[in-house]
Amino acid sequence: EKVKLIAKDLGFDDCRFTKAKEATHAQEFQKWLNEDKNGDMEWMENNPERRKDPRLLVEGASTVIVLALNYFPTEKVDLNKSGVGRFAKYAWGNDYHNVIDKKLKNFAKALEELGGEQRFYVDYGPILERDFATDAGVGWNGKSTVQIHPKLGTWFFLAELVTTLNLNPDQPMPNRCGTCTKCIDCCPTDAITAPNKMDPRRCISYFTIEHKGSIPLEFRESIGDRVFGCDECLEVCPWNRFAKASKEAKFATREFVGMPLIQFLGLNESGFRSLFRRSPVKRLGRERFLRNVCIAIGNSGKEKDIPHLRKVIAEESEMIKEHAKWAIDAIKSRSSLVHN
């Protein structure tokens, strides 16, 4: 209970324990890698054995402490306005890696005083976190593969500490999805290929965040007005009716949420870095962000936006030019259908 009180004092919304052991889906993860389903996410191939078993991360590891931190925005933003791009809600505030990292450093110091040795991770480390979150009873894996919390819904981050402290494990939580298939049915690109099966190479979040090159033509229209991530399978989850706004001030909605897409096209490198300072969007880089913006304008823009896209074609990199040309063609095609 003392450890859980420390977590609560640091602002975490849940804290639970499970035994350090091989991850439940370790073999499935290896098969997934063997089938190249990680796409451009080469980092997932690093240290696969360590990802499967936290005991390889900390000598004498006994417990995995799993933490949940709510990020559901307090502000309501009208994203249905014409000409506005969509960001995944997790990116509305400051970069969660930095926010959670500071909390975990303080948590680790407190555990040291209790005699523990530990390492901590915020999704960048080698650990199959959803397996341990399920085992610890934080929530369960939905059919979209997203972890669902009974009080936070789908709007929370996971973090873990692997420790030598021997803590009594919590009970796993049963899967409560029942017959619901809303997340599967709503996916714009059919990336959820079956219950609990996700092909990231079809996922809009993958294309707009992880994919490094040109976005395949077959997926561009489905991306719609999304410029960073996709929340479709999260939004429809019925468990979100219990979700409450995050109390973490650093997750407050930033000024770029709700900005017109055309304004993004005018950002130079320094403007991009300034606007997205301390945001996860900054890690995407200006070139890939403008690639996404061009697609969003192509899907939602009007003829008045074409001169802005032509300016991009005259001044920007080959990848951005190619997506801007596609956007102009998409707008013209849509406009001709309206006029006819």
Where are these regions (language model features)?
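Auxiliary alpha/beta "docking" domains used to position bulky ligands
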Residues: 1-176, 224
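Iron-sulfur cluster-binding cysteine motifs and their immediate structural context
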Residues: 12, 182-206, 226-250, 308
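A beta-strand-loop signature enriched in Asp, Gly, Thr, and Trp
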Residues: 206-224, 235-267
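Alpha-solenoid HEAT/Armadillo-like helical repeat scaffolds in large eukaryotic proteins
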Residues: 264-268, 275-280, 308-316
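Loop/turn-rich, solvent-exposed surfaces of beta-rich toroidal or solenoidal domains
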Residues: 271, 275-300
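Amphipathic alpha-helical scaffolding segments comprising HEAT/armadillo-like alpha-solenoid repeats
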Residues: 273-275, 302-313, 334-340
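Short inter-helical turns and helix N-cap capping residues of alpha-solenoid HEAT/ARM repeat scaffolds
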Residues: 286, 316-318
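Structural detector for internal amphipathic alpha-helices that build alpha-solenoid repeat scaffolds
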Residues: 290-301, 322-333
